[in-house]
Amino acid sequence: MSSYFVNSFCGRYPNGADFQLHNYGDHSTANDQYRDSTAMHSSRYGYGYNGMDLTVGRAGTGHFVGNERTQGYSPSHSAATTPSVEPVRYTQSANSTGTSSLSPPPDPLPCSSVASSSPVTETQSQHRAVKNSITTPCSTPCSSSNGGTLLLNRDCVSKASPLEEEKPAGSAPTTPQNVSDSTQPQIYPWMRKLHINHDLAGPEGKRARTAYTRYQTLELEKEFHFNRYLTRRRRIEIAHALCLSERQIKIWFQNRRMKWKKDNKLKSMNMAAAGGGGYRP
């Protein structure tokens, strides 16, 4: 409520003693319970108030001057003061003219001064504390001796503890799986041997001996019986038919020709030895 509204209200009713402004503050305070409008503005204007005056007296510290009649707290209050059910009036150093006006309630108070604030401010602080407890657990209880605040902190701890218990439970099953993945090497298709003949690591670093199956040997012998030398096209056809490589077919035919030549040489030598031994000059 601004001072403009108060001045217009007082100007509408000139008899200030008949229409009084009520103060619904603390009834046990030393200040008077009712104050008329003429007494409020007598020190401000210095004459009997009649009509509307739009001049506003301001303090040097803010928009609203001192001696505010609203709920709040005094800077001298400590965190350990006893809670009060009704709002507490606080006083600031006003200017030399002693003017007074109404001001809106202050911002919500921090956790340490919840005990000395009004019930509305306390509920706002509790609402913020419950919001913070969802994200972060309550570290330590408030420094005030308010019983409601301590119970609130216990609730915060009880709400935060299930969240902390669920996190290790959810991360526990993933740990053995990560360990098993790290210990077991992953085998890709290109790492597997397609054929036993493709092994390049021998006992002495040499190429391992190719072990042909019975069917492969029979087919190669048939082909060698008809052709001692193979063309490249025929070699590719045999390699696809027998699931072998062109190099293996070529090497097999080379070895087979060497063996055939060796057999023919031994046969010719035996025939020469047999014929030469029978001939005498």
From Swiss-Prot:
Motif Antp-type hexapeptide positions after renumbering to this chain: 187-192
PROSITE patterns: ANTENNAPEDIA (PS00032), HOMEOBOX_1 (PS00027), HOMEOBOX_2 (PS50071)
Region (Disordered): 65-144, 162-183
Biased composition (Low complexity): 132-144
Localization, UniProt: Nucleus
GO BP of this protein: anterior/posterior pattern specification
DNA-binding residue intervals: 205-264
Entry keywords, A to Z: Developmental protein, DNA-binding, Homeobox, Nucleus, Transcription, Transcription regulation
GO CC annotations, alphabetized: nucleus
Pfam families: Homeodomain (PF00046)
GO molecular function: DNA-binding transcription factor activity, RNA polymerase II-specific; RNA polymerase II cis-regulatory region sequence-specific DNA binding
Family annotation (SUPFAM superfamilies): Homeodomain-like
Record field: compositional bias (Polar residues): 68-99, 114-127, 172-183
UniProt entry tagged with the keyword Cell membrane: no
Function: Sequence-specific transcription factor which is part of a developmental regulatory system that provides cells with specific positional identities on the anterior-posterior axis.
Family: Belongs to the Antp homeobox family.
Listed name of the protein: Homeobox protein Hox-A5
The species this protein was found in: Morone saxatilis (Striped bass)
Gene (name only): hoxa5
